[in-house]
């Protein structure tokens, strides 16, 4: 077979054990070539008289990361023929591997995810290293396990645990897999294949059980109990993911196998997988999967052959919520951190916040006490710059004050080495302004974390025209090491995420002042898939932040900002959101939000100040209209961000909207979702509202041009006028 394609090799030892090795770097994914080769290798091993038993393993200490996801898009687009339904699950795994007259053992190191674990479950036994990861994460991509996993996993670990593993997509490590019965023994990487060889021969000699996973029943709960478990799982799934169909399909397929037998279950699995593969949800989630992995491809940066420099020590200026969160993220990934504050009281408060962040992990069972102590030892406090002389990067996270930040960057130049990266976590101030008094503007960069910084997955890396590509490469590497998805954006008010979403709340305010109910808007937007509606979000971030951020947009984009007095009026009355337990909602002792009838008087006053009246049409909007009137202005601003080159590509805006604002990933991100509706439709609706309600809704020139051509709003990298 062509060595550039994925393949398997077969090597027969003197003991009569054939070692079949999956080779498809970097994670030995199961491409169609690999699957066909696996079938050929198995057929050969079963034909050969010198082969007594079989061990399946993966090259480079990785079993298999699962089905090749890049093939999904090709199959969806019709450029590659899909394997016939059931080819892998029935023809290869059930009828060839599991039914073979020669025993098979899977030797698992590194990863056995998705199709990789399904291949392993087709074998008669599994040996794993202690830290190998085993799981079925297919639901994250909008499909179900399609190589027999829905039938084999419940029979190996029991129905309740199998449902949990599939519905949460969370893998287990080798040691935990042993206690569940998913693997039969643990071995070191060095001894793994040898242990598997001996195990396979022991099965042949009947010293160990010869088990066909598909027909095992001893781990399955009695039918009545199984139905109860399945019904409970359905109820929980409908509650947690009301917009998603595929988790319920997964439960149905599992049930079919339990009630009607594994063969019926495999047939239903194959049919369901085929249908889900072509669903909008799957297309959206596959797009997000690749968008997340594509953020580090930045023209003029990642294509220069630059290697990231080693960052050992990082200093954080400011121990507030953001600074302490950034410090937590860094020490959790093994970086030495200096946290600087202006006095002992503030410094101790910052260190205490970091401790609290770590202690919550201990409390949840995600960190041992020993690991807590070791991680905390990486943090040191400081009140001056003396200890900054050997730091590799500084991240400034002080209050949003231009002159203060300018002075800090001047001081940093005096104390830090010439190679030290000077980063700011500002979310509103122009980076050029912050660094204008410094001599070395090539090492100034934005590192915009989202709060809480140790939890939120996105990191906006903001570059100015003077920022060195090397500094960007360095920060991309740090972002990945601290388990963030780093997105490189240009320098502008709000950068990418905050700028895209500034019309989100403004559109909601416009609707409310013209008669739409506040709580209806929040209900509809939450039903659409957002974590919360715009008014609940305002309460969460606080009115002070909302007014300050809004002020930046009024200043920079006056012609398209909707100016409402609703929030300032409420703040005057000491309503500031969740912190004061009164905002758009009232909050009880447990911080539960409840609608507040008093809000009407503020809305009426804001309406009077704005000089607008209730529009009867806006008092009875459909859910669809509310979603479009809230999100189409966001799409409009995203088009500007893309056209101005603030973002390199539309996919970066998609992943940013998902990770920065909670846009539902199963809709593919803001631009992907917009393209499913069409530029013509979006433009026509914006024009209609612009005529009725003013310039806030006016389509930008880029959106209008794409609509006139009937072209999608997403641009490829080489089309983008990257003003980075």
Which residues are covered by each model-predicted region?
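Glycine- (often His-adjacent) and acidic-residue-rich active-site loop
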Residues: 58-93, 112, 140-143
């Amino acid at each position: 077979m062509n060595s550039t394609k994925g393949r398997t090799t077969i090597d027969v030892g003197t003991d009569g054990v054939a070692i079949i090795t999956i080779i498809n770097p970097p994670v030995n994914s199961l491409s169609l070539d690999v699957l066909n080769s696996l079938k050929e290798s198995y057929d050969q091993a079963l034909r050969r008289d010198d082969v007594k038993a079989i061990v399946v393993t993966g090259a480079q200490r990785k079993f298999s990361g699962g089905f090749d996801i890049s093939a999904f898009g090709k199959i969806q687009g019709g450029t590659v023929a899909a394997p016939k339904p059931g080819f892998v699950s029935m023809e290869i795994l059930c009828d060839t591997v599991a039914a073979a007259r020669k025993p098979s053992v899977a030797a698992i190191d590194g990863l056995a995810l998705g199709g990789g674990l399904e291949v392993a479950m087709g074998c008669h036994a599994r040996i794993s290293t202690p830290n190998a990861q085993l799981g079925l994460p297919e639901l994250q991509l909008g499909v179900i396990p399609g190589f027999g996993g829905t039938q084999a996993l419940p029979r190996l670990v029991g129905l309740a645990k199998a449902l949990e593993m599939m519905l949460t997509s969370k893998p287990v490590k080798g040691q935990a897999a042993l206690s569940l019965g998913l693997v039969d023994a643990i071995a070191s990487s060095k001894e793994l294949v040898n242990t598997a060889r001996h195990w396979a021969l022991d099965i042949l000699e009947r010293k160990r059980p010869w088990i066909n996973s598909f027909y095992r029943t001893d781990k399955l709960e009695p039918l009545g109990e199984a139905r109860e478990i399945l019904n409970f799982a359905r109820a929980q799934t409908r509650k947690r993911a009301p917009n998603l169909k595929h988790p319920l399909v997964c439960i149905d397929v599992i049930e079919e196998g339990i009630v009607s037998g594994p063969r019926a279950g495999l047939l239903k699995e194959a049919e369901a997988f085929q249908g889900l593969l072509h669903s909008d949800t799957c297309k959206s989630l596959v797009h997000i999967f690749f968008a997340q992995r594509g953020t580090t491809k930045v023209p003029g940066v990642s294509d220069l052959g630059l290697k990231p420099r080693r960052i050992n020590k990082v200093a954080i200026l400011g121990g507030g919520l953001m600074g302490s969160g950034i410090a937590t993220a860094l020490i959790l990934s093994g970086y030495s951190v200096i946290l600087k504050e202006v006095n002992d009281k503030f410094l101790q408060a910052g260190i205490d916040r970091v401790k609290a962040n770590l202690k919550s992990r201990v409390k949840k069972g995600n960190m041992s006490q020993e690991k807590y102590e070791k991680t905390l030892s990486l943090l040191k406090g400081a009140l001056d710059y003396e200890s900054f002389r050997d730091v590799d990067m500084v991240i400034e996270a002080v209050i949003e004050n231009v002159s203060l930040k300018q002075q800090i960057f001047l001081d940093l130049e005096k104390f830090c080495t010439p190679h030290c990266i000077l980063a700011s976590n500002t979310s509103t101030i122009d980076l050029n302004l912050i660094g204008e008094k410094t001599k070395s503007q090539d090492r100034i960069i934005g590192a915009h974390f989202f709060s809480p910084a140790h939890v939120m997955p996105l990191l906006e890396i903001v570059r100015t025209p003077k920022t060195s590509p090397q500094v960007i490469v360095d920060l991309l590497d740090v972002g990945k090491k601290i388990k963030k998805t780093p997105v490189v954006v240009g320098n502008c008010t709000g950068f990418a995420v905050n700028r895209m979403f500034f019309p989100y709340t403004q559109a909601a305010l416009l609707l409310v002042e013209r008669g739409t109910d506040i709580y209806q808007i929040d209900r509809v937007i939450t039903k659409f898939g957002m974590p919360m509606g715009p008014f609940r979000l305002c309460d969460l971030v606080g009115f002070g932040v909302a007014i300050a951020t809004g002020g930046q947009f009024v200043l920079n984009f006056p012609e398209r900002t909707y100016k409402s007095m609703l929030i300032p009026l409420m703040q005057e009355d000491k309503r500031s959101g969740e912190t004061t337990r009164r905002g758009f909602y009232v909050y009880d002792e447990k911080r539960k939000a409840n609608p507040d009838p008093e809000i009407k008087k503020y809305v009426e006053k804001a309406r009077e100040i704005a000089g607008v009246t209730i529009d009867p049409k806006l008092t009875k909007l459909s859910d669809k209209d509310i979603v479009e009137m809230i999100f189409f202005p966001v799409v409009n601003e995203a088009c500007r961000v893309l056209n101005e080159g603030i973002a390199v590509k539309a996919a970066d805006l998609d992943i940013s909207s998902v990770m920065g604002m909670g846009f539902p990933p199963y809709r593919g991100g803001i631009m992907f979702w917009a393209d499913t509706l069409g530029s013509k439709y979006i433009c026509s609706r914006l024009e209609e509202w612009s005529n009725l309600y003013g310039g806030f809704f006016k389509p930008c020139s880029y959106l209008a041009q794409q609509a006139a051509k009937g072209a999608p709003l997403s641009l490829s990298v080489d089309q983008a006028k990257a003003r980075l």
